[in-house]
Swiss-Prot record:
Positions on the Cytoplasmic side per record topology: 1-139, 191-324, 370-531, 587-1072, 1118-1135, 1204-1216, 1275-1315
Family of the protein in this entry: Belongs to the cation transport ATPase (P-type) (TC 3.A.3) family. Type V subfamily.
Protein name per UniProt: Probable cation-transporting ATPase C1672.11c
A molecular function (GO) term: ATP hydrolysis activity
BP GO terms, sorted: intracellular calcium ion homeostasis; monoatomic cation transmembrane transport; transmembrane transport
Binding residues annotated for Mg(2+), in chain numbering: 1015, 1019
Superkingdom of the organism of origin: Eukaryota
Reactions mediated catalytically: ATP + H2O = ADP + phosphate + H(+)
UniProt-listed Pfam families: Cation_ATPase (PF13246), E1-E2_ATPase (PF00122), P5-ATPase (PF12409)
CDD domains: P-type_ATPase_cation (cd07542)
Length: 1315
């Protein structure tokens, strides 16, 4: 890194984010050893770089998702006032104005630029210096602050500390005196270490910081000091304007700055604000000027400054050394507990068992170490990307490594060796086509065009969320370059395509994706929370057993030391160290199965959540229906009405090229109004646009033919083209000339200007030049609903709505086209025209009609989801009538059911927004309406026969909403009415990306566990907001969703749900099995302790390694059941459905072991334990009988808990598990049949001889136990619990239990009202 110099430029820049496509192995990397103890995680944060596809809102809670935390904890912990707007200063949308004092300046040589910037962006000061503390969540003593990290959707508390030397020395002494035990405790409980050795200190003078998230994750970071001799404003840029206290300089010269690196984000201390800020909103004042200024590049001093502030442009994950990984692994509580257990067993003379467990632990540590190291290295290799780039610095072009790029650097993207963007950048010249599938899941290539002067101002003004208008110029780090077109300079020379770096390193989109992988958010899924509560309860039981065993052994005269060892041994039995690891068994197998089916998961904890889905929302086009629509034909105006469909484009074009008739304009619209590009000899772009263009049979060219022919006759236009370096594509008809003698260039249409499709506007437009004529036209295509607002009323045919309704009712997709002549429009004027000027006063041309085919699997999947009582809804940007038709064809709506479509009452149009009225009219019958207040059908059945059929159909009506109505309902409808609508609405059409996101949140507010399946950039926000998002994309890992399917079929939804349910059931089964295994062994050992006996060394080994380990692993390999059941599996570990059978099984285990003990003691060959012996007794009939019968219990309880249908296949279909059970049963019977006390295995297992009749009894008792355990698990225990619960409710006169889910309660209320 270059050292800073004394004299530096005061220009500023900004930092942002880079992102690369990570492969499917990332899923397994999240399953690393530590994760099973650190708790579940989920990478759900969305980088700001793609937030233009995402409505930035905080997610509401749902049963399965991370509930939005209350800041009460952080406020109380750090004694802070939370800022009012929910964002820190660094995150505020008014970031540029928050701290600017009226009339005070910060810059000297940049004052004019900054004032112009603030004036043009209409930015006004909001807070003065004295209000900074409250606004920023700063404590009164300056020791703490709260910071909202928008990209991570994370709010953290930051506190400053200094080390108290005397208490630190005391801490060291305590660690020595306790032989390291205190060190381990403080290591596992870092809060207590911080409170013990640290003293609160203002952030300005602190030596180290603690940063704590709302999830309780704590980090201790040393403050670094970076030498830096320059002004403060050069670090924080023009974004922050601070009014300094009287008598102090508001832009001081500093010699160094203080910072910490938190999760690969740099937090720099601002001395005037007394708080740490993230360097992600840094803006260069030059960006407010035009692009020509930016193209001048940077000077050496500015480069050194920015390297110093932002660091290298490199995503370099810290790779821990082998010794660090080994220490972290060995000092984990799991292995410390193992070491404690091994020492304990050795002291109790269980040497063989202790040695085996030690070997297994060492192998496990080494295996985990190797796997973790390999995973980290692979992730580092894939996230780390460097390449040579040509950059313009100090007035010269030079080649440097991409790691040396800094914000503001101008580099060439047309370099053939550049295939992936090394940083987030803004396109300055030329255009390009990129693949952004790893960001949005959108498999369609995206076109990028050069930024304008207005774009530069928008770049300066945006904070965290990149506006949609800027995305067309924005090049995201890690995205692949498909094609780059160089700008036009002259007929013999092409220019270079240039881009300016905007964000570097971990601040890029790629960096945000990597961070979301390595720092996943915890999920609030109740299973994980309950499982650790259950472990705590088992530990308490172990303590109770400890006390009773100690008292019993004491009465038998056993030495105190032996009593302590034996009693502590009970704790290792009741709380087996491997118990937490069983939580991941089902998830691991599920992820492996999904990967084989082409479904990749970057968030393993979402697998179990998918098993609880209540509602799935689908996008339509490309998800439910085919992406590549077939064009049916076009309908053009004939006279005063729209005519029949024309399936051939040959008769649309007039022989007079200057004519302005409807058919010709429709043809020109289809030929030009698109964003297609040629890549490797093939057209790429939106499939709908490709179908539309191919229908015209015109040809597309990017060879600049038009520009070469125009210079002689249109000098002004030619000069402008060369100045602006424009390369417009051209399209040509399939014939050489109609009937007139036109040259080839006369027939060309040059696409002079393109206004790309915007979801909110639902249209796109182009400005087109006709050959060598001066004639220029504007052509627009978009949703039919928006045409009345941009077209002349008199241009619409009389049957406009009738024709539109006909096609949409029948499921066709309709695109409307319009055009107008641009009078006296030159090329230069066309480039300066605003979109509003082009898209107004248009003449309607006609309709393009596409056939909206369902995908072959859509109807089957929807039917299976409906059969499983998983609600399905459609959320699309398409026409509402088309969507309703598709919904009926796929089974989302009943074919003969009523669908009501609300629209705004025309009489209330003039009223204020909140007072507008909705008219709820049935699509199938214009005479049937819903009452706007009760949402009940309001119809007179006098004319409708038969009445019973009409009533039945109306009782089960559904609702379809459009985006504008949905927005009004969210803002103004009464909550109870809105909830009622959400319960009945199945179709949501004309929804913008932000409205899709908000719809998911609304469903989550009703306690639905929501899934969303989509395929494009418009779905990105909804995919992230949903509890389970499934993106249909070719990319293996996408930031768009936790799940990515490379197959463009919604069958992946069924696969995810089935495997999620199977994984959830497997997790419960494995956990219950480990719990009952502990219970069986605890009961056995507790009974034996009454006679100072215990199991033998190899008996413990046989149970733990030969029986338990294979069963626990292989019982999780059961595949999901082929059909979805109506009822979802429970996710509550402490529910009666789980606890009742568990308690019943424990009682049954006790009874079987007690009966076995009573019978063996009555046998004439019974060998009792030695009386009054202080040594451990192993070789006696009590131990032999209980060991053998418990072996059957370990095996059979595994079979009982290996649940089959309706969530998993039948247990015998799990062939590996079946084989293990059979082998173990054979081994157990063999041990029972041993007779000769001289037999090797008799001696090894320290067994005593038994009679033939008793052996038969043990086998019979094992079979009886299995039958009782199986029937009890499946029928008896639950039935008994339900009966007792019902009887208790009757006696206490309690009401029936009310569902915790709001939507279920609302449905019940609706049914009661209908009755």
């Amino acid at each position: 890194m270059a050292s800073p110099k004394m004299i530096r430029s005061k220009r500023s820049t900004s930092s942002i984010a880079s992102k690369n496509s990570l492969n499917s192995y990332l899923a397994s990397s999240l399953m690393s050893h530590d994760s099973i103890f650190d708790g579940p995680g989920l990478g759900t944060s969305i980088p700001s770089s793609v937030s233009s596809f995402h409505h930035q809102t905080l997610r509401p809670s749902s049963d399965a998702s991370v509930s939005q935390f209350s800041m009460d904890y952080l406020q109380s912990e750090y004694n802070l006032n939370r800022y009012n707007d929910g964002e820190s200063i660094a995150a505020s949308r008014d970031y540029q104005s928050l701290l600017r004092d009226n009339g005070s300046g910060v810059y000297s040589d940049e004052e004019e630029i900054t004032e112009m910037m603030l004036e043009e962006l209409n930015i006004h000061p909001v807070l003065r210096r004295e209000s900074v503390g409250e606004a920023a969540g700063l404590s009164e003593d300056g020791c703490c602050q709260i910071l909202y990290l928008v990209e991570e959707d994370l709010e953290v508390g930051i506190a400053g500390y200094k080390t108290n030397k005397s208490r630190y020395r005391l801490y060291q002494a305590i660690c020595l005196l306790t032989l390291g035990l205190a060190y381990l405790i403080f290591r596992w409980l870092p809060k207590y270490f911080i409170r013990f050795v640290g003293t609160r200190e203002p952030l300005a003078t602190a030596d180290w910081l603690t940063i704590e998230t709302q999830w309780g994750e704590l980090s201790k970071l040393d403050i670094q000091i970076q030498p830096y001799e320059n002004s403060l404003s050069s670090i924080f840029g023009a974004s922050i304007r601070v009014a300094a206290p009287e008598g102090t300089e508001n832009d001081p010269f500093i010699e160094n700055f203080r910072y910490v690196n938190y999760r690969y984000m740099k937090l720099i201390f601002h001395p005037l604000l007394d708080r740490f800020l993230i360097q992600q909103d840094w803006k260069d004042p030059r960006w407010i000027r035009d692009t020509s200024v930016v193209k001048e590049g940077l000077e050496r001093d500015a480069i050194n400054d920015r390297l110093c502030i932002f660091g290298e442009n490199l995503i370099d994950l810290e790779l821990k050394s082998v010794s660090q990984l080994l220490i972290d692994e060995v000092l984990h509580p799991f292995y410390i507990f193992q070491v404690f257990s091994i020492i304990l067993w050795s002291m109790d003379s269980y040497y063989y068992y202790a040695i085996c467990i030690l070997i297994i632990s060492v192998v496990s540590i080494l295996g985990s170490l190797i796997e973790t190291r390999k995973t980290l290295r692979r992730m580092r290799e894939m996230s780390r990307f460097t390449c040579p780039v040509r950059v313009y610095r100090d007035g010269f072009w030079t080649s440097i490594s991409s790691t040396d790029l800094v914000i503001g650097d101008v580099f060439e993207i047309s370099d053939p060796e550049l295939t992936i963007f090394p940083a987030d950048a803004l396109l300055l010249s030329g255009d390009c086509i990129v693949n952004e599938s790893m960001l949005t899941g959108e498999s369609i290539p995206v076109s990028k065009i050069p930024a304008t002067d207005q774009s530069m101002k928008e770049l300066f003004s945006f904070s965290k969320n990149i506006p949609a208008s800027l995305c067309k110029h924005f090049l995201f780090s890690g995205t692949k370059i498909i094609q780059v077109r160089k700008p036009f300079v002259n007929e013999k020379e092409e220019g270079a395509s240039l881009a300016m770096v905007v964000r570097t390193g971990f601040n890029t989109t790629k960096g945000a994706l990597v961070r979301s992988m390595i720092f996943p958010k915890p999920t609030n899924f109740s299973f994980y929370r309950d499982s650790f509560r259950f472990i705590t309860a088992m530990f308490i039981i172990a303590l109770i057993g400890f006390v009773f065993s100690s008292i019993n052994l004491l009465t038998l005269g056993v030495p105190i030391a032996t009593i302590i060892i034996r009693a502590l041994d009970l704790i290792t039995i009741v709380v087996p160290p491997a118990l937490p690891a069983t939580l991941t068994i089902g998830t691991t197998f599920a992820i492996s199965r999904l990967r084989k089916q082409g479904i990749f998961c970057i968030s393993p904890q979402r697998v179990n959540v998918s098993g609880k889905l209540d509602l799935i929302s689908f996008d339509k086009t490309g998800t439910l229906t085919e992406d590549g629509l077939d064009i049916m034909g076009v309908s053009v105006i004939e006279g005063s009405e729209l005519g029949d469909l024309r399936s051939n484009s040959g008769n649309l074009c007039s022989k007079d090229l200057l004519s302005n008739d409807s058919p010709s304009n429709l043809l020109y619209t289809m030929a030009t109004c698109h964003m297609l590009r040629y890549v490797d000899g093939e057209l790429v772009g939106d499939p709908l646009d490709i179908k539309m263009f191919k229908f015209t049979h015109w040809s597309y060219s990017e060879e600049n033919f038009l520009n070469k022919k125009m210079s002689s006759e249109q000098a002004e236009d030619a000069a402008y083209v060369r100045t602006q370096q424009l390369i417009p594509p051209t399209v040509s008809p399939p014939w050489n000339s109609p009937s007139n003698n036109y040259t080839e260039s006369d027939l060309e249409l040059g696409i002079v200007r393109t206004f790309e499709f915007v979801s909110q506007l639902r249209r796109m437009a182009v400005i087109v030049k006709h050959g060598k004529f001066k004639k220029m036209d504007a052509y627009v295509k978009g949703a039919p609903e928006i045409m009345p607002s941009i077209c002349k009323p008199e241009s619409f045919p009389a049957n406009y709505q009738e024709v539109l309704d006909y096609y949409t009712h029948n499921g066709f997709r309709v695109i409307a086209c319009a055009s107008k002549q641009l009078e006296n429009c030159t090329w230069a004027k066309a480039q300066r025209m605003k979109r509003e000027q082009v898209e107004c006063d248009l003449d309607f041309c006609g309709f393009i009609v596409f056939e909206n085919k369902l995908k072959s699997t859509t109807a089957t999947v929807i039917r299976e989801l409906n059969d499983a009582r998983i609600r399905t809804v459609m959320c699309t940007g398409d026409n509402v009538l088309t969507s309703i038709c598709v919904g009926k064809r796929c089974g989302m709506l009943p074919e003969d059911g009523y669908v009501f479509l609300p629209r705004f009452d025309e009489e209330s149009e003039s009223a204020d927004e909140a007072s507008r009225q909705l008219v709820w009219q049935a699509i199938e019958n214009n005479e049937i309406f819903l009452d706007p207040h009760t949402l009940r059908p309001n119809v007179d059945f006098a004319d409708h026969e038969p009445v019973s059929i009409e009533l039945a159909r109306l009782k089960d009506f559904h609702i379809a909403l459009t985006g504008d109505v949905f927005r009004w309902l969210v803002d103004y409808a009464p909550l109870n009415v809105f909830h009622h609508i959400l319960l009945k609405a199945q179709i949501f059409a004309r929804m913008s990306p932000s409205e899709k996101n908000e719809l998911v949140s609304c469903f989550q507010n009703l306690n639905y566990c929501v899934g969303f399946c989509g395929d494009g950039a418009n779905d990105c926000g909804a995919l992230k907001a949903a509890d389970v998002g499934i993106s249909l994309s070719e990319a293996e890992a996408s930031v768009a969703a936790p799940f990515t399917s490379k197959w463009f079929e919604i069958t992946c939804v069924l696969d995810v749900i089935k495997d999620g349910r199977a994984a959830l059931v497997t997790s419960f089964s494995c956990f219950q099995y480990m719990a009952l295994y502990s219970a069986i062994q605890f009961i056995t050992v507790s009974i034996l302790y009454t006679t100072n006996s215990n199991l033998g060394d190899f008996q413990f080994l046989f149970i733990d390694l030969v029986i338990i380990l294979p069963i626990a692993v292989f019982m999780g390999r059961s595949r999901p059941y082929h059909r979805l059941a109506h009822k979802r599996p429970t996710a509550n570990l402490v529910s009666k459905r789980i606890l009742s059978p568990l308690i019943g099984q424990i009682v049954l285990i006790c009874i079987i072991q007690y009966i076995t003990l009573r019978i063996v003691r009555r046998e004439p060959w019974y060998i009792p334990p030695p009386a009054n012996s202080s040594d451990t007794n192993i070789t006696n009939s009590d131990v032999t009988a209980l060991f053998l019968i418990s072996c059957f219990q370990y095996i059979f309880i595994g079979v009982v808990l290996s649940i089959g249908p309706p969530y998993r296949e039948k247990v015998w279909r799990n062939y590996s598990f079946t084989a293990v059970v059979v082998v173990l049963l054979i081994l157990t019977v063999k041990l029972i049949r041993l007779q000769n006390h001289k037999n090797f295995f008799m001696k090894l297992f320290q067994l005593t001889p038994t009679s033939k009749s008793f052996q038969n009894f043990l086998i019979f008792a094992g079979v009886i136990y299995y039958l009782l355990a199986a029937s009890g698990q499946n029928y008896i225990f639950i039935s008994m619990t339900n009966f007792i619960s019902h009887l208790n409710n009757r006696l206490l006169n309690r009401r029936t239990k009310v569902s915790k889910k709001l939507y279920k309660r609302l449905f019940a209320d609706l049914q009661n009202e209908q009755v």
